Amino acid sequence: MTNIRKSHPLIKIVNESFIDLPAPSNISAWWNFGSLLGVCLILQILTGLFLAMHYTSDTATAFSSVTHICRDVNYGWMIRYMHANGASMFFICLFMHVGRGLYYGSYTFMETWNIGILLLFTVMATAFMGYVLPWGQMSFWGATVITNLLSAIPYIGTNLVEWIWGGFSVDKATLTRFFAFHFILPFIISALAAVHLLFLHETGSNNPSGISSDSDKIPFHPYYTIKDILGLLIMLVALMTLILFSPDLLGDPDNYTPANPLNTPPHIKPEWYFLFAYAILRSIPNKLGGVLALVLSIMILAIVPLLHTSNQRGMMFRPLSQCLFWLLVADLLTLTWIGGQPVEHPFIIIGQLASILYFSIILILMPISGTIENQLLKW
């Protein structure tokens, strides 16, 4: 009799994806983040489901319903903070995952990479809409400012913004539809993640050396299941430490003030994980130019495979490209810092220089360093 694990139509899929999957023998901890993202997604869907049972998407009661969850619902405060800080964990894992892909040349798997970019956009949209739901000051003004960016689109901009708002300002209709979208998008993300995995398993995983590992594969279980569980435990300890000791560390105090359309907060800023893109947006004094730069700061990932000039896949043996990669990481951290600062000297010029450097590294310096390294190998 055949093993049910290998014969049953449904269990067979799980088996081929998580148990008998041939994996490279040398993948490092940087390959843990895919599974961590899966866990983050499940955690967000579950906590979100329980929050949705008590939340009301009405401008009059949204803020009060969140307060009610924190005060009166059994462990409601914990579910709420798991959801809010779980989003931060999600983005930390996302940035690490994308960074790993850039460093080790995983972007040469074009289908997997492009679905990944689509996933990144969808997760960002979901997080933005989720931030609007508590209906605090930063929720309201964040929604107003970010949706207003679409008015920069020539000819249809203003109509588009009013269509998204469902009126002439961010109001009840906006909150209701944002809640509906925020609820449905994680399930779309789940489907996209399954497709992402499907395309990955067509080619097999990349590995740190960047060369084919077909001659040296090991089964995913138990080697990488145990490794993933270790990564998971570390992440959960970090998340629970954040929730139980400093749950509001990454939030904005302004969001504990109910939304008031008549009172603008002094510094409107998004959650920390959007600050790098927000800094790029603000560094261009023209509205349409800023919006284009904002979109391109993420869309640029789609052309990274086309800019790959090196004969080697990853950066493991490419010191020049390594320097540029870590310069890019430092630059993104600088942009994140600038995005949270007021628009005044010297922050304006720092933001503009960091934005120029960001695009220069990816579009100009990386391809040049790849070509130089090819020449160095010939010598």
From Swiss-Prot:
Keywords: Electron transport, Heme, Iron, Membrane, Metal-binding, Mitochondrion, Mitochondrion inner membrane, Respiratory chain, Transmembrane, Transmembrane helix, Transport, Ubiquinone. It holds the Pfam family Cytochrome_B. This is Cytochrome b. Coiled coil: none annotated. A ubiquinone binds at residue 201. It is found in: Mitochondrion inner membrane. Heme 1 (or BL or b562) is low-potential and absorbs at about 562 nm, and heme 2 (or BH or b566) is high-potential and absorbs at about 566 nm. It comes from Herpestes ichneumon. GO terms for biological process: mitochondrial electron transport, ubiquinol to cytochrome c. The lineage of its organism: Eukaryota, Metazoa, Chordata, Craniata, Vertebrata. One of its GO terms (cellular component) is respiratory chain complex III. Component of the ubiquinol-cytochrome c reductase complex (complex III or cytochrome b-c1 complex) that is part of the mitochondrial respiratory chain. The b-c1 complex mediates electron transfer from ubiquinol to cytochrome c. Contributes to the generation of a proton gradient across the mitochondrial membrane that is then used for ATP synthesis.
